[in-house]
Curated annotation (Swiss-Prot):
Role according to the record: Involved in the gluconeogenesis. Catalyzes stereospecifically the conversion of dihydroxyacetone phosphate (DHAP) to D-glyceraldehyde-3-phosphate (G3P).
Gene: tpiA
Classification of source organism: Bacteria, Thermotogati, Deinococcota, Deinococci, Deinococcales
InterPro entries on file: Aldolase_TIM (IPR013785), TIM_sf (IPR035990), TrioseP_Isoase_bac/euk (IPR022896), Triosephosphate_isomerase (IPR000652), Triosephosphate_isomerase_AS (IPR020861)
Compartment list: Cytoplasm
Name used for this protein in its record: Triosephosphate isomerase
Annotated source species: Deinococcus geothermalis (strain DSM 11300 / CIP 105573 / AG-3a)
Subunit structure: Homodimer.
Length: 244
């Protein structure tokens, strides 16, 4: 099974000076562990972090344009992210789908651009509370997965993020996470020629130091996409230690 990934999504937090201080604190506190760490920061922070993160900690973006270049004011291209040192980029986060009306087709286009530039897309999928209450979470999430990976190569990561658990303090149980992660892995095996076990599947949704170990102990969960807890270095170190 693949090395677990602790993907730290800062969302719209931290100025460049705050990012520099955070990276210095992490350098002092972090000890090598079993999990790979990746900081997914606002684009304006990436140049600062590229020269300040501890060795072995990867860098990534939170979004990317579906276009390669051109007259798209305010957009960040995959080539720009790659040039600044990014390895990963999130596509299709539920906040982008909700606040910016991103469709599965748009998400797939962004993932294709990311791969064309040498980035690894972290494709986010997951259901809302009303879908879960209807018992349709597996069908909904797999439909979203298929639409969001249309024409996308197999060098990707999938993050299962139940929308009802993001920023709410509610967390899917370890069994909930495993149910969807197993279904996603089976679906990926049908979509790609790579071995099913080679794909990394993350869980995202109110992940904290006190629940990450039980969630990531599930056989089909290979790490976590962490939001709020990623902003505090002590929490990051605790989560990294929990994945030893």
């Amino acid at each position: 099974m693949s090395q677990p990934l602790l993907a730290l999504n800062w969302k719209m937090n931290k100025t460049p000076s705050e990012a520099r201080a955070w990276a210095a604190d992490l350098s002092s506190a972090l000890t090598p562990g079993n999990a790979e760490l990746a900081v997914l920061a606002p684009a304006i922070d990436l140049p600062v972090l590229a020269g300040a993160l501890p060795a072995g900690v990867a860098l990534g973006g939170q979004d990317v344009s579906r276009f390669a270049a051109g007259a798209y004011t305010g957009e960040i291209s995959a080539a720009m992210l790659r040039d600044v040192g990014a390895t990963y980029v999130i596509v299709g986060h539920s906040e982008r789908r909700t606040y910016h009306a991103e469709t599965d087709a748009v998400v797939a286009a962004k993932a294709r651009q990311a791969q064309a530039a040498g980035l690894i897309p972290i494709v986010c999928v997951g259901e809302s509370l009303d879908v879960r209450e209807r018992g349709a979470q597996v069908d909904f999430t797999l439909d979203q997965l298929r639409g969001s990976t249309e024409g996308v190569g197999e060098n990707l990561i999938v993050a299962y993020e139940p929308v009802w658990a993001i920023g709410t303090g509610k967390t899917a149980t370890a069994d909930d996470a495993e149910e969807l992660a197993a279904a996603i892995r089976e679906a990926l095996a049908g979509l790609y020629t790579a071995e099913a076990r080679s794909f990394r599947i993350l869980y995202g949704g109110s992940v904290k130091p006190d629940n990450i170990a039980s969630i990531c102990a599930q056989p089909n969960v290979n790490g976590a996409l962490v939001g709020g807890a990623s902003l505090n270095v002590a929490d990051v170190v605790a989560m990294s230690d929990a994945l030893r």
